UniProtKB/Swiss-Prot annotation:
It comes from Methylococcus capsulatus (strain ATCC 33009 / NCIMB 11132 / Bath). The modification N6-(pyridoxal phosphate)lysine is found at K230. One of its GO terms (biological process) is glycine biosynthetic process from serine. The record marks H229 as: Plays an important role in substrate specificity. NCBIfam families: PRK00011.1 (NF000586). Catalyzes the reversible interconversion of serine and glycine with tetrahydrofolate (THF) serving as the one-carbon carrier. This reaction serves as the major source of one-carbon groups required for the biosynthesis of purines, thymidylate, methionine, and other important biomolecules. Also exhibits THF-independent aldolase activity toward beta-hydroxyamino acids, producing glycine and aldehydes, via a retro-aldol mechanism. The keyword Transferase applies. This is Serine hydroxymethyltransferase. Pathway: One-carbon metabolism; tetrahydrofolate interconversion; Amino-acid biosynthesis; glycine biosynthesis; glycine from L-serine: step 1/1. Belongs to the SHMT family.
Amino acid sequence: MFSKGMEIAGFDDELWAAIQEEERRQEDHIELIASENYASPRVLQAQGTVLTNKYAEGYPGKRYYGGCEYVDIVETLAIERAKRLFGADYANVQPHSGSQANAAVYMALLKPGDTVLGMSLAHGGHLTHGAKVNFSGKIYNAVQYGLNPETGEIDYDQVDELAREHRPKMIVAGFSAYSQVVDWQRFRAIADSVGAWLMVDMAHVAGLIAAGLYPSPVQIADVTTTTTHKTLRGPRGGLILAKANPEVEKQLNSLVFPGIQGGPLMHVIAAKAVALKEALQPDFRHYQSAVMENADAMAKTFIERGYRIVSGGTRNHLFLVDLIQKGLTGKLAEEVLGRAHITVNKNAVPNDPQSPFVTSGIRVGTPAVTTRGFGVEECRLLAGWMCDIMDCPGDETVIGQVREEVTHLCRRFPVYAN
């Protein structure tokens, strides 16, 4: 038998040290990667429960194993909360990730070789939207749309032209690095004009949508997918939503299980249920509003300091800083900011002359710093410090000064207060 007093510390000190160091890094560094956030202690608690022991292949009420009466309650809570939060008629909470949720949709609605029209990775799309290195670009005939070079916004005329030329079976809307509001209805009209399915990947803005601060695609698209972390602030995982269509719902369920997954991760589904309940609370809207205000304040500070923001600003939680005119690579910017304990990710920008491993931009997002309690004042300061470093990336004195400021700010705003 096991004692409940068993701990990793003292048994696997090497592993425990790495975990402790990562916890310190999260407390002592400022996190600006747009896809990262901090899960609440309640979400972390759910992931550490005995639910991890239970196999539950199938769906609530239709399992292939016995002893599922309690995990059925857990999964049903998650499903009903997801439907309520997003105004969906259908929800599948079993996908282990956003990419697996997307894969299930592809396999449910398409056949290998079918044409898919999605956003180019270089213009802000995601790997699963048709990138050649991904299953979506290998198994399917992927055609890519991008941004209007003059406005920096999605080129809907190009989407329309490509749809009429290639007659895709499915159009994918959504992004991983786009700072404006997507016109879901325009995508719907284009999809209808060529008889295509419309899938929306709202992973990055799910929290904003849940709070009613960003247009919802859920009753516009045929199927909507998301992750449950990022702005939703839950565990790492995926979620599929849809408007009422019994045939599509049946296909989606069978493609998640047994199509691409076996047993669901019940401890993660429990954590999803917790996060969804947190997102249903009134203060969640205040949090998401602050996320957007902070992103806007940072973007405007960069612009004031002479940096170019792709699409001219932000109307969500993130933005891309184009460093081409500064003669700076995204890789170097990520490195020097990291030395000051500011974490960002290098990111390709439209017409990027650098490779994806180097890039000419950085992506900046405010979900994590807002969870810590940063407001507009702190975010303006932070953006200014970042500009100080990128203005003279080889100046260790500046990096050291900013690192001190970061240390003081992190101590004022701990992630997990004692």
